[in-house]
């Protein structure tokens, strides 16, 4: 269809023009036939001419000309069928032949009815009916519309004018609910369309007076009938668009009831009135009444001011909840909440108050309410505090009352977890005194004050304390210069820590906190000699008690003691720095030759003292001691010596020699060690001689000549000396190598020489001429030259140089000549290209002759030219042009000469052979030339145009060409070349011209012409005379040649061939030169094809033909365009091809075919139109989309182009249902269909006058069932029923579905598939199922209705195998097998069997099948019942019962115990009463009692140890370490009395009571009741048993019992007085004997010391304090060992620790002098003193380690190290000091020589800023030399408390023989003291021992700290002791330390280290015991020990 008429006309016109034929043919024709329809026409005509070309042109008043391509029917008949015409339109048809013949015809097309005619149901009402239609295609004058009733009688008729959009008409005043038929006909002019009929109905009237009666699960509906026709009513109850119930009722009914509805739910009720296929409705929102909430609970969740309200949402819907809170009828708060909220909270309430909560469920305007009560938690008391200042056994608590409501307070006192008091006080109380409870001093108790309100309570806790007691036996343990140690015993009761303070007068110096386990403390950093007050305060919380003591530190020794003689021979002066701290005075001693010369006391303000009248040169010692408070400090010693006297009469003589001096003197008076004679010069000693004091002369040789020597004779005595001085000089030496130089000067001579050796004063230089003196100069000795000026040029002189030293001198001579002067006024007189002429004036002074030289580049041009001394000019000839020469004139005098010079330049020559060329360039000229003769510096080349300089350039001399750029094209230039040499120039000229420029912008254009081309260009640059234009063919053959003047810009070539390619060239001409050609190419336009036509077409195919084009062409391009002008397809064909076909085109589409003729890049085209046949639609599908009265048909659009679709729907019986025409649709909905019915649809595709169709089927969805319900719901089955759809609908069956998809069995109990019910089997118990039912329509092709759904849950099964059993006395455990059901959990209740009181009730998760029920009453029967719950379904109950176990009796409170005031005592017994009420029988009846007895001591416990059984009386009597025992068990008779609480029984403890075990028999190991000790404090507890023996009277291993608190101490009576007196007498006798023995030994010791010590001498070599030792029982010999059995060690250690470690300190004092009598002479040698770190820690000579001597040095074998024996070898260890920087090599040498494999280091290199040991090993893995040994670290393992390193060591002489050494470095030993715990060091020692045992061939193990005695001795002793523990049944710590001190001084240096060894042994033994009890042999012995922490209280060096 050609819709774009105007555009198409233009295309056709162009086509006609382009395809016009060459010859005209006359074609007459006759019209044969013409036919029209609505959209097309058919016209035929006949002609007898041939061939003819016709065109059919037609048009209307609404469209322009359109064309129809005629076809030849036969040889003479033509026809054309115009399509796509407009219906109802008048067309003018014109048939035209190409020769001008034509004919005209007028035809009108038929009008079309409306495309869509329908009843507008939206505008149709009860009394009106509106129809509407779309405009007909084409032209319509009006529409005729008729209305018929159901009897086919015409009722109304109307004419409606044409409209551009929808047209409509409404019929009025019709009857409600009646059926009608409407017809419509389109009219256009005289023509009418066929009529179209539709059916319609008016809408029936709705019901009236709709009424509702709501209930929670039902609604009652009532109404009144409306007017008009009614067939039936349909009642639809909907919920949010979903139908809940849908039912039809008879038209006579006026009410209906809906049941099984949701409470409180809002429904949409619609009552539909149905008549004539239409319906009208009235709807109303209706609501069921809501239900009240369930499980309403009001809880406080432990909160004070809020209540949480929770409830379960009621069935159905709730819009909101109205919640009110009230108290005693008054509403306090109300709120409204919306679901799904099922809880809320009321805040800001009064604590402890009872409230009423009411919840109203509101659904719309309806509501239902429910109430419950709840109480808030009472508030805690506020400001709860305890108060105590002075009470040690009581305190008071105060509080502020809480806010809100409460009833009373409960006061509970706790001792940790033990309740001491539980009482109730009134609400008006605000304090409570906790007294009369015998609380323990210093203990912290916890007090809980509980506020009770109803059954709720709230509590607040605080802590209260009793005041602690002060420490006991506080005393000063030790003191030194800066520290003061105190010790004490722990107080009674409890405390948390100690506060240690130290007062210096009124100033607090130290204030520190210590742990409660501390028993001593050392104050450090104190002032020496000062008196301090130390205070120890016991702290318990913020309460305290203090105890104080005074002590004084040892005064400090003075420092920096110096003794100085101040250069005096008979006096010594001493000074020192005052000692720190407090000093009373200083004691100063002067000692000479071990004799005290003076003993003076000086004031503390003095720090110096002097000694007079001393012997010269003597050595004295000064000793200074500080004294403060009667205590002396350590002594400080310094030495000093007086100065010796000097000699006299010193004489010196050189004997006339320059290298010799002799010295003599008189002997000095006094003591002299020797003389020292020295020769010095300028303060530096050149030679010295040591002369014996008996000799008084000496001589020196090999001295320096001329030197003045200072001669010193020194008298030496010790380090001091006296001196005598004089001086003398040696004879000086001569100078050497005199040199005289004129320095190239004419009036000057310089004299130089080599300095004379030795010393001298200066030089004298004299110059002469022929023996006549001229000048003498004095030259300093530092210089070796001098100058003489104003001499005669060229003259010879004599020079003399003399050396002067004091009164001595020596001389040497030499000669020299001055330089002559040069000539004057040397001038270049004349020059040419080859000549130079010079002149000069004569020189001054003496001249022998002149010499003239000519040089070029410093090379001589001619031989030397000699002239007489009178010559003044010379001329050089035959020289080179332009060359630069140098002319020299020399003045000669003797062998010396002087020169003058001048430079000369010859004139340069011009260049030759100039050539100028443009080389085809338009803007440049190239100039070349040949050089002239001689030298040039450069060339200057210039270009001139018309005598104006254009360019000028300087060219290097080696260049011979130059190019001028940026010149004008085609112009003439003059070129000038200048030769330059120095300042001289020469020039030559020449002429040249540039090439003309080519034209630009050459273009060849065809102006779309087929036979001409025009070439154009732009003017050429520069100078041009004319242009030559050449025309050439494509192969370059010249076709034409023309010339144009310089002003021309284009030229046109005519008569060319179409489509042919040409070339054009243009040349610029100037001065006979041609430019480079400029070229362009052009082509004429090719001709288009003619006679273009369509030869064949089909639905996917089009074929075209044409006549070939004239001229030249390359190919054809053929294009096929879509209607939207997009390219569909293209092809390129050969020029000989005259037809082409297109395949696979789009159906029904109108295409445009264009053929383009190509020649080169030019083309010409022709075109024509053609259409393909349309296609049918695809994938036609019908769908009901879950609707019952509609079908949707959808399809894929038809391929290609089309005009519209025609849709025809048929009923199952073949009758047509509906007919529609649409274009752009792919889906159509048919409405008003029967539910479940099958329909057939035809879809016809139209494109132009062509069409195609396809068929599809569809079935509507059947109506759904309704009223789904469940019945007979059991565990595994149920019945389900529903109501089916109406009978007038189509359906076949029902389908039942469910979720979850279990394998169920569905049974239909009826024979018909349409039956409305099924029975379901195989359900899972307790599972929730969702069932849905659908209606099925059809058999093979089924459709389904919307499902109706319902939920149901089966009942869960009950649990299996419930079994309950007791767990303990207050708990039972129940287990069961869960049911094979779906369930949420269990509902569990536990009741007492006797009272049916619920003790336990809870919901339990489904995952659990085991439950522990606790907090029950012991020994009661309980019934446990369990139900399985699954949502709202509950299983059958399952029950089981059991009895709880018996438990230990409840713990009696602290006040329930034996009262010490209610007892009768004797010396061996205690009589008291026990009441049955002391123990409750709630945990079981008390079966037995026992009495527990304990001796009272300071460490008393509150209750007996939880141990069964306790020791018996016999064990207590025979083992002093046992302090507690029990009696035999006796049966309880408390349960025999109805009122057992008042029953009591008497106990007489210690009276051999039968019930307590009776009299004790040592032969029987049983519990008994023996007599108590006289005058002994006992504490008594009663132990009650609820379970002790089984039925066979066998005792349980773990019986159940409880104890009362121990009574307060009850002391038995004393023995008679006679026994006491006897004991006292015996004690006094023993004391007297002991005093006598002590006196005897003291006297004996004093006598021994008086014999050994001289009275007049003081030794300062070794300071050993005196000590007296008493060793009773040893017969005067010191003990060497003290082995202790392992099983007795802990008791032994406790005895040593008694009385502040008194015995242990005494034992350590016994070791003080062990081994000290041995000699240390080798260590004291002066050569070895520097190798000792400390001067008081020296190795004994007998046990020291010796190194191999080096170079026969007897002291090279010394190192401060000692052999120490072990348990296995005599030399098992080497104890040594930490290496010094100078002894590191010796240390490793010792390790190498002693075959050491293991080194133990127990110190840090630096501790507290002080160097303790040098870092003597490599810091990384790089090897280092230590002497001759090479050491390399192999590995390093760093652990938290020690580090293990491995070293590889070898000798430099034996590199292959290396050895591995392990280095064990313990890093946590504190600077002063011992490690904090024993565990760490024990583990370290065992680690080292393990490595030692794995090195069987190794030598001794080296152990060192800093000094090698304290920590070293502790380590060695501990290693030996641990080995004893592993191999023996005894341990000997004393013997081990004694043995160590025999081999090295001070081993185990401090008492705290000695104590620490005992603690290690104790902890190891404890660990062994614990390991044995745990029966775990792998348990480490150093673990699971509760180690005590230790700190050394004594500063020590180790």
UniProtKB/Swiss-Prot annotation:
Residues 1704-1964 form the Tyrosine-protein phosphatase domain. This is Receptor-type tyrosine-protein phosphatase beta. The keyword Transcription does not apply. It is an enzyme of class 3 (hydrolase). Its EC number is 3.1.3.48. It comes from Mus musculus (Mouse). Residues 23-109, 113-206, 207-291, 292-384, 378-466, 470-556, 557-642, 643-733, 734-821, 822-913, 908-994, 995-1088, 1086-1173, 1176-1263, 1264-1357, 1358-1449, 1449-1551 form the Fibronectin type-III domain. Glycans are attached at residues 28, 53, 75, 173, 199, 268, 415, 422, 480, 575, 599, 653, 830, 1041, 1097, 1164, 1186, 1213, 1275, 1368, 1471, 1475, 1519. It is a single-pass type I membrane protein. Monomer. Interacts with TEK. Interacts via fibronectin type-III 17 domain with CDH5. Detected in a complex with CNTN1 and NRCAM. Interacts (phosphorylated form) with FYN and GRB2. Interacts with IGFBP2. The modification Phosphotyrosine is found at residue 1982. The active site is at 1905 (phosphocysteine intermediate). Keywords: Angiogenesis, Glycoprotein, Hydrolase, Membrane, Phosphoprotein, Protein phosphatase, Repeat, Signal, Transmembrane, Transmembrane helix. It catalyses: O-phospho-L-tyrosyl-[protein] + H2O = L-tyrosyl-[protein] + phosphate. One of its GO terms (cellular component) is membrane. Substrate binds at residues 1871, 1905-1911, 1949.
